Amino acid sequence: MGCSRREFLKGSVAAGALALVSPGCSRAKGIADENFEPAYLKLHRQGKLKKRAEELWEVLKECTLCPRKSRKNRLAGETDVCGLTDGFKVHSAGPHFGEERPLVGSYGSGTIFFSNCNLLCVFCQNWEIAHRGDGSPVSHKTLARTMLRLQKMGCHNINLVTPTHVVPHIVRALQIAIPGGLKLPLVYNTGGYDSLETIQKLDGIVDIYMPDFKFQDPEMANRYTKEAKDYPQAAAAAIKEMHRQVGELKLGKGGVALRGLILRHLVMPENLAGTDRFVKWVAKELSPDTYVNIMGQYRPEHMAHKYPKIARRITRDEFHQAIKWAKAAGLKRLD
């Protein structure tokens, strides 16, 4: 059985250190289809990746990477909810075996945990990283090396966790990693609070989108995040664009993901996440064939004890009801 994300973080390699791992630890290649080519290689050959990287870097002068649209000049040292200026931090990186089965395969998902967050859920299970910003500053070159080392370790993909606020840095690092031989699919593993414009800039770069869709009710989103009242509307728009770009999840050898959308939803106490509405939205606005992970591992972490309605785990009946709703909505691919 795969480890939880918190267990993985305890055993993963600290930021920067993975770039120094000896190539001697290399496993068999993690690519699930020898004919597969990640989308970003075509964009790179066409010379468009460089232009996209430049456009994204310009956004940092008046930041609109997420729906908060703070318009802070991060290149001049200004910051907002995410707490970042022109640099970025990585907490840890390594093969992760606790993600969805199509990502894990035999050799794990090559997971890179970025520090800080633009959403700041009060129940965050990784609050030390997201809220407190634990991690180490790294360069674009080091991030590129980390991607390449994960590939050499046999990982099936490069899994970018909480990437929204560091998209320009990721694309810059990608430009460095490609000449080094990077050829794994990129996984954009996001909390779902992404601006539509940012996701559009990633068209042709990301192979696998894996967003959360946390809340259907603006009031719930506002209460249990850092006042992201527009979360339901923003997440819906971003996820529809992700689906337009990559479509349904496509699998290669061994059932390993190559391209497509994996959609996550965390069941919360008293149906505060609006699970019944979520599954109907997926079936209607995306497709009944969307790969959906209805997650039952909610536990009251960080500041959740201050909010009585979410200060407990969900019950078995609550989770079973969520699955019933998903099946009743016609969803066919439940993780």
What are these regions (language model features)?
Residues Q151, I178, D203, H243, ...:
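N-terminal cationic-hydrophobic initiation segments that often serve targeting/anchoring roles
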